[in-house]
């Protein structure tokens, strides 16, 4: 079965979030179970630099101007690149300029991505024709609309990685992107008086997926649906919306092979974890104290990620003699709040504003607890990395966090199912109480070791997800 993944990021060449990690691993896992998966991407400078050897598949002019479609390989996966420098030849973030202003031609840049995705199901490459076009997030949402317009020559699947980003553009762009005005309708592309690329993906695809079972349920409710609850609950009722958990790329995220950490370790040989903790404490200029409970957080600094909840309750970590290390960037007021914490408690709290791939690996490997107190979290990958590395996740019960972390209670520890710490209410008080429970378990080294062992024994391999996607494709 020939699968075309249509997306806008690919780890490690270009990454702004978890979407890139998924596309860096899922196609490879699908090929390993006998599918023929390829990826379609815009030819951003970072992508071209990483895939320099390509051949021309097609050259054409359409609503987006002059376009060259190229084909190459990366990590054994076939990659199509849409080479249109006037649209994609911009360094840095693929969606906005250095001042965080969305590019004014995003409607055209991502319409072209969807258009080429549909054309690859109708013979644009005479050697390979997609049987399933699998589009990811709003950037690729128009794939399904173009396929619908062509009489549905292939099956279509749309994956929601984050429903909060909807790709909404003015109605008057419709004629510029080659779609009939009849599609601008509540039973179509229209959402709140605008074109919604995300809604297009949901409405016109044969099936949609969310990146965890709980998130697939949550987005049918007004709190999480951003005005799409009617459409989403309808899809759920028809069994056209399912949740499939993301996996972990074990070639990159495994403590026994991780190229970024100085000391490898595994479940049966944990000495390396203590050494990584000492390295991490040294990096952040915190006391190299093995007995201090070390909390780490690697995140975008936004309210969605619960950073404000942590700012309000971090003094609990200090009070109990713990340490807190944070890596991330985001909202200026939250960056400032985190910096002030580090200045107030220099012996206990340290922060690095920005992103650093190598440091993020050392933090996951060297920490004792990884904090993911999100208000909502479609799937979440950092808690999965935490489980893999024996760094117990402390999470809020939402989305993929609820599906992947089992709270440590006396019952779950006895039953060998506990894998971390879970709190329900998105309040500083609830987070504070959960931090206290983590300290209480840390005082019982044998119980802590049991939970850590059970955490590391979890299977979140991409093979599992690849099999679930295959089952979905086969029933379309």
Curated annotation (Swiss-Prot):
InterPro entries: Glyco_trans_1, GS/SS, Starch_synth_cat_dom. Its EC number is 2.4.1.21. Keywords: Glycogen biosynthesis, Glycosyltransferase, Transferase. This is Glycogen synthase. Belongs to the glycosyltransferase 1 family. Bacterial/plant glycogen synthase subfamily. Pfam families: Glyco_transf_5 (PF08323), Glycos_transf_1 (PF00534). It is an enzyme of class 2 (transferase). It catalyses: [(1->4)-alpha-D-glucosyl](n) + ADP-alpha-D-glucose = [(1->4)-alpha-D-glucosyl](n+1) + ADP + H(+). GO terms for biological process: glycogen biosynthetic process.
């Amino acid at each position: 079965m020939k699968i075309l993944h249509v997306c806008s990021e690919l780890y490690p060449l270009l990454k702004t979030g978890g979407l890139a990690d998924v596309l860096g691993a899922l196609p490879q896992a699908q090929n390993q179970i006998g599918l023929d998966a390829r990826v379609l991407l815009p030819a951003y400078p970072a992508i071209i630099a990483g895939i320099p050897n390509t051949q021309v598949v097609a050259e054409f002019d359409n609503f987006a101007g002059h376009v060259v479609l190229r084909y190459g390989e990366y990590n054994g996966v076939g990659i199509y690149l849409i080479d249109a420098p006037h649209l994609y030849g911009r360094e840095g973030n693929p969606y906005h300029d250095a001042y965080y202003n969305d590019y004014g031609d995003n409607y055209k840049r991502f319409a072209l991505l969807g258009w080429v995705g549909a054309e690859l199901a109708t013979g644009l490459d005479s050697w390979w024709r997609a049987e399933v076009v699998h589009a990811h997030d709003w950037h690729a949402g128009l794939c399904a609309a173009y396929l619908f317009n062509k009489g549905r020559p292939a099956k279509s699947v749309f994956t929601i990685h984050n429903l909060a980003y909807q790709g909404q553009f003015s109605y008057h762009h419709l004629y510029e992107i080659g779609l009939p005005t009849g599609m601008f309708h509540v039973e179509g592309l229209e959402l709140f008086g605008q074109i919604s690329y995300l809604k297009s993906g949901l409405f016109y695809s044969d099936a949609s997926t969310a990146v965890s079972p709980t998130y697939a349920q949550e987005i049918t409710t007004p709190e999480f649906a951003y005005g799409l609850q009617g459409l989403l609950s309808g899809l759920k009722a028809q069994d056209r919306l399912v949740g499939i958990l993301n996996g972990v790329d074990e070639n990159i995220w495994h403590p026994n092979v991780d190229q970024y950490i100085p000391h490898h370790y595994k479940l049966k040989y944990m000495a390396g974890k203590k050494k990584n903790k000492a390295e991490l404490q040294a990096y952040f200029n915190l006391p190299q104290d093995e007995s201090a409970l070390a909390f780490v957080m690697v995140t975008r600094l936004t309210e969605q990620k619960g950073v404000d909840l942590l700012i309000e309750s971090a003094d609990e970590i200090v009070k109990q003699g713990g340490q807190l290390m944070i890596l991330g960037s985001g909202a200026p007021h939250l960056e400032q709040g985190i910096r002030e914490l580090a200045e107030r408690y220099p012996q206990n709290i340290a922060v690095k504003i920005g992103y650093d791939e190598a440091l993020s690996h050392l933090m996951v490997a060297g920490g004792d607890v990884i904090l993911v107190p999100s208000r909502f979290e479609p799937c979440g990958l950092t808690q999965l990395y935490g489980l893999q590395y024996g760094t117990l996740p402390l999470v809020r019960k939402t989305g993929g966090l609820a599906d992947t972390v089992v709270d440590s209670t006396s019952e779950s520890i006895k039953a060998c199912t506990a894998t971390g710490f879970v709190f329900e209410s998105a309040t500083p008080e609830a987070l504070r109480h959960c931090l206290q429970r983590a300290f209480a378990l840390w005082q019982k080294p044998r119980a802590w070791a049991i939970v850590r062992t059970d955490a590391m024994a979890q299977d979140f391999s991409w093979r599992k997800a690849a099999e679930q996607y295959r089952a979905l494709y086969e029933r379309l």
